[in-house]
Amino acid sequence: VAGLVPRYREPGFGLARLTLLVPSSRAARTLSEAFIRHAGENGESGLLMPRMIAVGDLDLDEKLGAALDPLGAADIPPACDPVARWLTLDGLIAEERAAEGMEPLPGRARLNLAREMARTMDRLLVEEKSPEDLWSEPVLDQLGGLAVHWQHAIRLFARVNARWQAELAMRGQVDAATRRNMLFDRAARRWKEAPPPHPVVAAGVTSAALALARLLRVIAELPQGAVVLPDLDRDMSAEAWDELGRAGAADEPGGAVFAADDA
């Protein structure tokens, strides 16, 4: 906060023109409180806050699309309701187990399995993996004696997932994780083609999501963009600091804070 305020505050606008991408809603609240404390400690009666967008949570609400791309978010298919997905997966699991001649699961156990399958689907979508990757040779080698049981479980998962994807296509919907990836990729393309006229900073955002990583790469290369990674080692050697370039420090007052060759 102490670095963002002097760098991005503008007379009459405060930080209102700054877009700040943060990992979660909790981080946004913490930063809001930090901005307020900073203003009070510096004897300021008030400060226009930056626009903060939580991008790290998997279960993001519909505000993400409007925040990143207000003109194009409507072109992306809507996300399915998570409860509807959970209950649909429950029914698909029962049908697929019956088709395989397996013993029926009690209702609660089947719902728990449906919840775990939904989480696995989300993780695969976030990391842009397919169900086939779960029974690749490197994975099976790690499982040892459990490999046969694993293959049976993955076959059930693959069948349920295939039917669920067909159901989504029929509804004209996508999983929430898929929609999030599409929103990130659309924002990355638009910002790369037409950089926003205001500063954009991603602060403390780390994720296994490849789409989010692609967006962060674009932000880092924007004329007024920056990516602030967490856990910066303040005890790095002078050689490491030199490799970082300006690291956000202008050579002269009012000068550029980042150079093209900065790490």
Segments from the language model and where they lie:
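Nucleic acid-machinery interaction/catalytic patches
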Residues: 1-263
